[in-house]
């Protein structure tokens, strides 16, 4: 399968059309951004690492009945995916208080939440991806109530599977972002699952092992991404 026309370029990936109208190629970049593109930089080999991690996790979820856009890993940076009509809703699942949840509600960072919190954000960079509820989403025409209920249920199911997977590899899944899209009258999980889209803390030390190291200039970004890759792929 070969790339034809570039369909889209985002902060972390490029998407290309192929000769098959149902399939696209997602190319992972090393570019890094934070705070809705206000901070920009690069993380060496990030695209390679994130493609490897995402491919493994999509395969895991597919085996557990979670339908995704993933078809196969084509190369170090390229992933073959089903074409999606992206739903403009970012779904965030939170297990431990961190990031904007701490700022909004005054939680102490690291507080284990009584139950996972599922949040919806409007996928719109110009508006800084604002938090929204179901009524906002319906009023904006980005999803129906039935679709939003499906997204919430699917996100909760993914959380159960991923929390257990990462715990076995001595990682806390603090929170993570999911994106979904429509494909042939079906809603599939899209985008990626990686240290770009998840917060990972070491199970024993609580060391941050994700893009927060880039966001807050903590150093050791490449090493953290590489360590997550080793644990996810069981590369001891």
UniProtKB/Swiss-Prot annotation:
SUPFAM superfamilies, sorted: SAICAR synthase-like
What Enzyme Commission number(s) does the record list for this chain?
6.3.2.6
UniProt catalytic activity: 5-amino-1-(5-phospho-D-ribosyl)imidazole-4-carboxylate + L-aspartate + ATP = (2S)-2-[5-amino-1-(5-phospho-beta-D-ribosyl)imidazole-4-carboxamido]succinate + ADP + phosphate + 2 H(+)
Pathway-wise, it operates in: Purine metabolism; IMP biosynthesis via de novo pathway; 5-amino-1-(5-phospho-D-ribosyl)imidazole-4-carboxamide from 5-amino-1-(5-phospho-D-ribosyl)imidazole-4-carboxylate: step 1/2
**GO terms under biological process:** 'de novo' IMP biosynthetic process; cobalamin biosynthetic process
Q: Which family does it belong to?
A: Belongs to the SAICAR synthetase family.
Name of the featured protein: Phosphoribosylaminoimidazole-succinocarboxamide synthase
Q: Name its species.
A: Pelodictyon phaeoclathratiforme (strain DSM 5477 / BU-1)
The gene designation is purC
